[in-house]
């Protein structure tokens, strides 16, 4: 193969990869704008986390609570009323100033705040035995690996005997159900089940079934960084955090009128669609370049 042809191949591939990266970066900018849009529409101003992070301080500092004490300024030393911890959690981080500021920011929303439980029901998954798994059927078991941020992926499927769908009606996953991971590395991540395939829910996952909320709005809200932090705050466990359905339903969220929820959901959906188009364009650009290179090689 001539040197000129080799160089041309290199240029085509490099150009395609560059265009793909540009498309992906543009798509990511769109996706990153969703959180700011949602927070802005709700009137939530985020506290600056660095202002409340524990810092190393001089060992000679006094432990009084005056405002000029560095421990107080950095949120490492604070007071909590006994009534707030009696019969409740006593881990200090739960009552940290940063978490209190997050809650205050949410309560300062343009809209009233209510617990998720006032508008949604919750169903925990069932502990199906791995001995019941089979190679193929029309009954899918949704496990924690299927629940990602904003999406329920069915690329890897686990199957149960078909009759289980009728045997365990309580644990059926319905189309447009909001699913949440309740343990492990993806704890707190929520996604909407957009399939009509028959599915049951495995243990340590939950269904948040909305009564009169826009599910897409709720999904994007719970996937906000501040809500992911609140979910972790309400979790328990050492090496592996776990959260219960009861704790999830206690979380307060802004409740705009349904029309406003629908408006925000539509806008966010449009942003995601544009981002998906850009991602697909990037893939197609690279694929066309590969085909062009293949033709050049075969032609020589």
Question: Model-derived features: where do they sit?
Answer:
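A short glycine-rich beta-alpha junction/loop motif
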Residues: 1-4, 198-206, 213-216, 236-262
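Non-catalytic DNA-recognition/assembly elements of restriction-modification systems
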Residues: 2-127, 250, 254-300
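Short helix/loop capping segments that flank catalytic or ligand/cofactor-binding pockets
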Residues: 7-8, 150-152, 189-190, 216-217
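Short coil/turn segments at secondary-structure boundaries
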Residues: 48-53, 129-137, 156, 233-235
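Sequence-specific dsDNA recognition surfaces
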Residues: 113-132, 145-175
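A short beta-sheet element
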Residues: 143-144, 165-171, 175-223
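Flexible, active-site-proximal loop/turn residues at the rims of small-molecule/cofactor binding pockets
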Residues: 148, 185, 257
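Short amphipathic beta-strand starts and helix->beta connectors
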Residues: 192, 234-237
